[in-house]
Amino acid sequence: MATPLDEKLRALAADEAMKCGLDVEKLTFTRAGAKSSVKIAVDADERPDLDLLEEASQLIGAAFDAAEEAQQIDLGPSYTLEVTTPGLDFPLREARNFQRNIGRLANLPGGGKGRIAAVENDEVAILPAAKKKAGKKSQGKKAGKKTPQAPVQIYPRAELAGSTIEVEFSPAPAAEQELLGLTMAEYHELAKSDEA
């Protein structure tokens, strides 16, 4: 639960991050004796580089220092500020979180996996990940064919809140790549044709 101080810090950080084209995704304040800690995760449509994170950190730090001087906030005798990106384990919640990860494979709530194809209003189009069938062992490795799933599923975004991005070490299967880049209306048509 956010405290009044957390809310003030988030508002200050969001104003400064916006100057760099960044959104504040998460803020954690920890009071630890003489040295407190403020950790802020920021993101943008294009992944921020280290220079942009440094610029945001300087702006946010200056805003915090000015607010402390004006006695609007109290971070304790000293504090450490860490500005970073959310990371792959950050749970997707907002439309912008899903939008920034179109084309990436996600671990969905309930245990499924699917590729984020499109986001519009409060809907997300998901291309279900192909499931591997068991196959013969070949040269010490398990061989298997991927069984295609339904071409697309449309979910209310709220049902997918908490999804996380999965690390992939190879490109998406060709069948999934071919289905990326359609409009939400086209994904709705695909979903309807699959139901028939």
From Swiss-Prot:
Compartments reported by the entry: Cytoplasm
Gene3D superfamilies (alphabetical): RimP-like superfamily, N-terminal (3.30.300.70)
Pfam families: RimP_N (PF02576)
Function noted in UniProt: Required for maturation of 30S ribosomal subunits.
Coiled-coil stretches noted in the UniProt entry, renumbered to this chain: none
Protein name: Ribosome maturation factor RimP
Keywords: Cytoplasm, Ribosome biogenesis
Keyword Signal attached: no
Similarity section: Belongs to the RimP family.
Composition skew (Basic residues), residue ranges: 131-145
InterPro entries reported for this sequence: Ribosome_maturation_RimP (IPR003728), RimP_N (IPR028989), RimP_N_sf (IPR035956)
Main location: cytoplasm
BP term (GO), one: translation
CC annotations in GO: cytosol
Signal sequence interval, chain numbering: none
UniProt-listed PANTHER family: RIBOSOME MATURATION FACTOR RIMP (PTHR33867:SF1)
Ranges that cross the membrane: none
Region entry Disordered, spans: 131-153
